[in-house]
């Protein structure tokens, strides 16, 4: 869904049934460049980028949803005013990502709240296609925040992630020179 206002994705399911593969589709749910986005009670399994992805959007709620066996369970990217709560992110490479990346139509992600989620046992090997930025995310990640401002993370249950519980970083750590 691109460039829409008032998107409601409620009680939907996307799943790649052949297990984690780089040839799986990139996204389970993918609203971008949109306003007033609601993802509620959805299930995303097996995406080679993000199970639940919201990008370059504003006024977002992702709640009561399940993301499993994706590279990134839930990803909020280059977005404004998002609440991500009461979700389960498990057995992904990384549970929840809050990124702001260059060269996208909307820059300066801000005012993101991640709370009352379970980001547990994110232990799936990274199977993103080569060249994807999420291909750099280490297996066993609970939450990564990169290059955003005014991000609040509170009252989440995180366990069994193995590599990192919560990481705050800036983009330069991930840039490479040609």
Q: Residue ranges of each PLM-predicted region?
A:
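Short glycine/acidic-rich loop motifs that flank beta-strands on beta-rich extracellular proteins
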Residues: 1-2, 18-27, 48-55, 71-78, ...
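Right-handed parallel beta-helix
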Residues: 5-18, 35-50, 58-72, 80-94, ...
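C-terminal amphipathic alpha-helical segment
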Residues: 112, 122-129, 140-141
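Flexible, solvent-exposed coil segments and beta strand-coil junctions
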Residues: 132-135
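Beta-sheet-rich non-transmembrane sensory/scaffold domains
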Residues: 139-142, 147
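Conserved small/polar residues in nucleotide/adenosyl-binding loops
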Residues: 169-176
């Amino acid at each position: 869904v691109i460039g829409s206002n008032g998107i409601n994705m409620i009680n939907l399911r996307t799943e790649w049934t052949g297990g984690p593969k780089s040839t799986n589709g990139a996204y389970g749910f993918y609203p971008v460049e949109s306003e007033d986005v609601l993802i509620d009670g959805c299930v995303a399994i097996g995406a080679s980028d993000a199970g639940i992805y919201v990008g370059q959007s504003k006024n977002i709620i992702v709640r009561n949803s399940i993301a499993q066996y994706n590279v990134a369970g839930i990803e909020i990217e280059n977005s404004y005013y998002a609440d991500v709560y009461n979700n389960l992110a498990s057995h992904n490479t990384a549970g929840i990502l809050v990124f702001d990346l260059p060269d996208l139509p909307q820059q300066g992600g801000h005012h993101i709240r991640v709370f009352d989620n379970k980001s547990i046992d994110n232990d799936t090997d990274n199977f993103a296609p080569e060249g994807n930025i999420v291909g750099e995310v280490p297996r066993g990640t609970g939450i990564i925040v990169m290059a955003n401002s005014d991000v609040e993370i509170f009252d989440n249950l995180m366990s069994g992630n193995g590599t990192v519980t919560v990481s705050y970083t800036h983009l330069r750590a991930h840039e490479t020179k040609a």
